[in-house]
Amino acid sequence: MSFGMTAPLGKGGSRERGMNNKRVPMLWLGFAAWIVLAPAAASAGAGEERSPEGCTVIGVGRLATVDGSVFTSHTDCCSECRVHVVPGRTFKKGDLAPVHWGMVYFGRDDDRGCLPLGDYGKVIGHIPQVEKTFSYFHTGYSQMNEHQLAIGESTCSQKPALDVAFMEGVTKQIMTIEQAQVFALERCRTAREALKLIASLVETYGFLPSCGGSEALCIADPKEVWVLEVFSVGPEWEPGSGKPGAIWAARRVPDDHLVVISNYVRIREIDLKDPDFLASTNYMREAVDRGWYDPKSGRPFIWQEAYAPRIKEGNLSRLWLIYSTVAPSLKEWPRRRLTGSSSPFTMYGQDLEGAAFYPFSVKPEKKISVKDIIGFQRSAFEGTIYDMAADPAWLVPGPQDRLVKSLLTTPFASPELKRLLRIASHRTIATQGYGMVAQLRGWLPDPIGGIYWFYVDNPYVSAYVPIYAGVLDVSPFYKNYDYARFSEDSARWMVDFVEKLLHLRWQEAVKDLHAARDPLEEGFFTSQPEVEAKALKLHEKNPAEAVKYLTDLTISRMNDVVKMFRSLRDLLLTKYTGDIV
């Protein structure tokens, strides 16, 4: 079953709309501007106010999926997309574990920058080490370990009074969310264990935002999914003060539900008598002390409203798209699709419904698959008022004096090209960085049951490759990326190169992408039963042999993805450059 989110662009026919013919040369001028300014396509201008919009998380309980898997997922805009296996280790009693600043960075303007693989940044503190750690996959925001524990992360907004900025030697808080994720993956087997450990770490050592906001995590294991939301407590906090160094709350996702986090906290009312809720002791007290909530008012305490600013359209639109797609009959959703009974509004002027309109989670009307999650992650809001490729600015004169969509039409135009053509910008779900879908299956041994469907760069263009939880290594192509130095031996650079070439003639070139990528990716899915049957047979005789088989297969597949993108790059260069007219 598919929710139809992966239909390729480029089928737009003629449209009877008036247009000034001066737009035609403007398109070519805009394309020239895109070529010059493409490296800055995903970054905001200096001094612009930015709110978190880079991460979309989807979590799904086991009774809502096609085969009983549990899913958590993550699309991320972080530049630290390199993935490598950190093996489990043993330590002496009394050893200390370093706490780092600099695991993540966000492009050229971030002074944290790219570090050598395995260097996790400046050590700003220590916590007690455990005697044995588990193997996990390390990325900017590490996401999965050998025991099928997986975490999706989404930075959220918080009220400015809660903000904490890192100043070496001054800031007392030391625990970033990405560091807490690493500790959880190294030390925990279940979602509940991870939730409680992360909550304890941010309370004890102080939550230090690395992206300037609060954080939401979708933590999953083969049995259940939890959402954990964390706010900082401002720069005045002191360790040892007896006050928690963070404000946090958590809610369990019903087993037959799907939850979305779109850079905005999702929990509203908290009922600590219900075992599906957990929270810090100060979850309400901080709001009372700061004058943000009056217990005598008679109004219920709403977590979301107490600590977060008003939700923005870029957050709402993702909630709307996914919830209205998987649960269309749940309620009267805003009409924002361009087909059927479309809305009289456009993204230039419409009523926004507010965060309270959306439930914490929804029960999908059809069972969800890995491919469905991938489809949402690749979404550019096709067929909706947010579809930037549907903007009339792309229309050019065609045969018989009819207006047709320019071959340059793309949902991923650079900021300069959008300014030139006066295209209203909107945040797509697909965004540059890296991401994953974690598929967790309790009926299989951990090394086989957990699959880390991983991509780099833009998921709309990239290929998802399955990495099994028990593998001992990954392809060197996926361990290599430096934004300041191009490399043929970097998966991220190869995908990015292809994406830039697609813009030479997007409407035609994207068909070449599908022709090259889709059969390879589909092969990963169709061969899954055979691969896992063989791995399970090996595991029953010798678990080490199963791990070796899956490691070799995973590395080979990751290499095949890079080879495919190299070949596609060569095709696009020869087909859409040179002597074309």
Predicted regions and their residues:
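Substrate-recognition/cap regions that form aromatic- and gly/pro-loop-enriched pockets
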Residues: 403-532
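Boundary at the C-terminal end of the N-terminal hydrophobic targeting segment
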Residues: 42-47
